[in-house]
């Protein structure tokens, strides 16, 4: 079955990102298994729903790929892919997992797993770029991902220091100082989330054959919606500590 150039481009693009996000979906499952449930039932249900949607989307695209894309289904497939990619940003879950667990009982194999997943993402993206000789995808976008990953590691380290400092010095701080520490931790978390969104969507900048204005608009919309999802994840993971700190401030 012959595919037009535009359809073939969508097939290659969709397959590449579905492969990468499948690995991230598996990393989410690992993170969920290694973290106890929170008391927020709605949040627990939502995170599993997002993971399930991610996995089903990957399966859907895999079936489409193995069965050969049909021209009438490519639009639907790409629309569903875009819709779910807005709601499934696995690195955000792992980043917030780090922020909460690194200060107390972080397990070493989780760190190793994340490093492995990040490496696979970069290798997968770089390998397909060269093997398939896609003209409008530059290999240097992989370097962008690793630079963002390094910055993410630095911001995570800052968040861990703030988190541990807040725990150790909580009893000796005044109400104002305690609130300032908590605000610093919160804004550091926001910065980490925003940076992770950039890391995930930076490679998309070279994938569009449309006008520059359309590409910028699309990226801005996706990154904004994804950042809101990040904030939802941050809210759930840090809710227990936020309530505890606020209760102490009130007392």
Named regions from a protein language model:
Residues 96-129, 139-151, 175-195:
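The cytoplasmic-loop to transmembrane-helix boundary for the fourth helix
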Residues 230-251:
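Membrane-proximal linker segments that couple transmembrane helices to downstream signaling/catalytic modules
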Residues 16-35, 45-68, 84-90, 115-127, ...:
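Hydrophobic alpha-helical transmembrane segments of multi-pass membrane proteins
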Residues 73-77, 139-157, 219-222:
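Alpha-helical transmembrane segments
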Residues 34-48, 74, 98-111, 137-138, ...:
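Membrane-interface helix-boundary motifs at transmembrane edges
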Residues 1-26, 145-152:
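Hydrophobic transmembrane alpha-helical segments in integral membrane proteins
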